[in-house]
């Protein structure tokens, strides 16, 4: 099993470690609810170094990425990032990812840990038609640290006092020196709160981590495991590969039409999306349950006549709302906010209601 450059720190801090995407990762430290609360109210630090990262370079790099992704990369400039998807020809999702434009011929991609090898192979399979474009997998060399929460920029400013990082716009990034290397600091995240994700060489990761923890000590900063990362993203309704999205799901049936630019020239999966656009049958929605039972992935969802209308994608008890919440893929006729539903849990039908996403309106400036 692979380890990140911060594994020894996590173990020293008493984290409960699990296998996630082939990496030994912290699932929790003090506890999911306390960690979740720290991010919503103060600041939290996440090791997300298991995520895959690639460089795409060459004069035709933009043309290549436009072909293999759904969003319009032509709309962003140097120092800007974009959320996007890679699709199979049938419209199923290869992965969701963020692309960072370093320059006109250099792009940096961050992909899901569980899809890293698959994604690199997919890109490699399609790059041949774009002469001069090179792919470079840097996953094993780089660490990724996320600092999230309403006090994130106060903490960041103590470690990088001259960088003016609080002025970064959403989905923009800057490169700043740290130790003997450069760190890429991007105003992105997976929590809904203000914050950044910082990419830097493994050799400098622990020094940055400990500096941020020390800088946030009086603000209540906490290290955050994958457990709270999941409850935070679910409160925001953000997709997780293998749950809301996968190779069987078309983005137009998963609340992701906004990243599929049909007016862009041909891209892989475009024709399939055009077909679904004519008659989308399903939609991913948020819901809450009336009782205390917790909905889990693949649990069946029914209408008031007890007819099956879909299944749960993700579920948890919201630490903020203190009630069971989830996402579900439902037939579109039942996707309207306020629609009554029933989730089958251990042989019982638990009543609930379709809810508007996000569940929580985080204080993101």
From Swiss-Prot:
Disulfide pairings: none
Recorded superkingdom: Bacteria
Catalytic activity of the protein: N(6)-[(R)-S(8)-aminomethyldihydrolipoyl]-L-lysyl-[protein] + (6S)-5,6,7,8-tetrahydrofolate = N(6)-[(R)-dihydrolipoyl]-L-lysyl-[protein] + (6R)-5,10-methylene-5,6,7,8-tetrahydrofolate + NH4(+)
Keywords: Aminotransferase, Transferase
Biological process according to GO: glycine decarboxylation via glycine cleavage system
EC number: 2.1.2.10
Keyword hit for Transcription regulation: no
Gene Ontology cellular-component annotations: cytosol; glycine cleavage complex
Pfam family, one: GCV_T
Statement: the UniProt record of this protein carries the keyword Nucleotide-binding: no
An example molecular function term from Gene Ontology annotations: aminomethyltransferase activity
Assembly with partners or alone: The glycine cleavage system is composed of four proteins: P, T, L and H.
UniProt record similarity statement: Belongs to the GcvT family.
Function: The glycine cleavage system catalyzes the degradation of glycine.
Stated name of the protein: Aminomethyltransferase
Species name: Chlorobaculum parvum (strain DSM 263 / NCIMB 8327) (Chlorobium vibrioforme subsp. thiosulfatophilum)
Protein encoded by which gene: gcvT
């Amino acid at each position: 099993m692979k380890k990140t450059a911060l594994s020894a720190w996590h173990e020293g801090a008493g984290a409960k470690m699990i296998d996630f995407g082939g990496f030994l990762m912290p699932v929790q430290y003090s506890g999911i609810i306390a960690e979740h609360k720290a991010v919503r109210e103060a600041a939290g630090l996440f090791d997300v170094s298991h995520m895959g990262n690639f460089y795409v370079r060459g004069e035709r790099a933009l043309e290549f990425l436009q072909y293999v992704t759904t969003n319009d990369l032509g709309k962003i400039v140097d120092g800007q990032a974009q959320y996007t998807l890679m699709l199979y020809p049938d419209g199923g999702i290869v992965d969701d990812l963020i692309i960072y434009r370093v320059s006109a011929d250099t792009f940096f991609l961050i992909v899901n840990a569980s899809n890293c090898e698959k994604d690199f192979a997919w890109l490699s399979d399609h790059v041949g038609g774009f002469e001069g474009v090179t792919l470079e997998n840097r996953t094993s060399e780089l660490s990724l640290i996320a600092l999230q929460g309403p006090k994130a920029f106060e903490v960041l400013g103590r470690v990088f006092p001259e960088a003016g990082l609080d002025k970064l716009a959403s989905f923009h990034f800057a490169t700043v020196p740290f130790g003997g290397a450069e760190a890429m600091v991007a105003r992105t995240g997976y929590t809904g709160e203000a914050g950044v994700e910082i990419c830097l060489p493994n050799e400098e990761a622990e020094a940055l981590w400990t500096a941020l923890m020390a800088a946030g000590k009086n603000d209540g900063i906490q290290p955050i495991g994958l457990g709270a990362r999941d409850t935070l993203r679910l409160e925001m309704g953000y997709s997780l590969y293998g749950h809301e999205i996968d190779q069987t799901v078309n983005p137009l049936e998963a609340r992701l039409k906004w990243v599929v630019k049909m007016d862009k020239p041909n891209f892989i999966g475009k024709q399939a999306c055009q077909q679904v656009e004519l008659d989308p049958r399903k939609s991913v929605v948020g819901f809450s349950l009336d009782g205390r039972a917790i909905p889990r992935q693949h649990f069946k969802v029914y209408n008031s006549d007890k007819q099956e209308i879909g299944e749960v994608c993700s579920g948890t008890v919201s630490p903020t709302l203190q009630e069971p919440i989830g996402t579900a893929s439902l037939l579109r006729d039942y996707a309207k906010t306020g629609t009554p539903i029933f989730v089958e849990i251990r042989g019982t039908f638990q009543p609930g209601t379709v809810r508007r996403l996000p569940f929580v309106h985080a204080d993101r400036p």
